[in-house]
């Protein structure tokens, strides 16, 4: 009664839509790609903006570096924008994250954690990446790291990430 069944990726995708995400970039990587593919496959989910209809633009990029930089660029135009990745992809995004942090760009990065080092175990999840998210980047800059504990938190944190990013003008990393 009053409940729906969702995967974690679907909960994050719907949370991003609730949070006003208008641009979602990604490079296919397990397990993060399912989120963007869910948004893309469900274009029936329309969002109202200023009395008109709108939707989320989903862009599959050539690599993770382009994904984070495209999301930052979209944010600079005034759109609420995000990207999603997992461990190895986040490693490639660090320079773009540093640039966003230095320039106070309110971009959201959804970081799907994997267990184990390197490419990890794509089908097993853990919190091995928390420290990396907190300290990633060249030099010091402000950032917010949200670490969701369950599907409900994934949903609400995905929406809240955009509010924090916009209010404090910093990158937000959402760990799931």
Name what the model sees in each region.
Residues 1-136, 141-143, 147-148:
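Thiamine diphosphate
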Residues 1, 143-176:
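Structural signature of the thiamine diphosphate
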């Amino acid at each position: 009664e009053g409940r729906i069944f969702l995967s974690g990726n679907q909960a994050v995708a719907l949370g991003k839509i609730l949070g006003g995400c208008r641009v979602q970039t990604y490079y296919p990587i397990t397990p993060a790609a399912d989120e963007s593919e869910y948004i893309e496959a469900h274009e029936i989910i329309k969002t109202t903006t200023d009395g008109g209809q709108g939707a989320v633009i989903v862009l599959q990029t050539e690599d993770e570096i382009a994904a984070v930089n495209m999301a930052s660029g979209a944010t600079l135009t005034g759109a609420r924008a995000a990207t999603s990745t997992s461990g190895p992809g986040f490693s490639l995004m660090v320079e773009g994250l540093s640039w966003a942090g230095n320039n106070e760009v309110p971009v959201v990065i959804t970081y799907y954690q994997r267990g184990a080092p390197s490419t990890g175990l794509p089908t097993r999840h853990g919190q091995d990446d928390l420290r990396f998210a907190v300290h990633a980047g060249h030099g010091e800059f402000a950032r917010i790291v949200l670490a969701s504990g369950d599907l409900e938190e994934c949903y609400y944190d995905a929406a809240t990430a955009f509010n924090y990013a916009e209010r404090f003008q910093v990158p937000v990393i959402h760990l799931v």
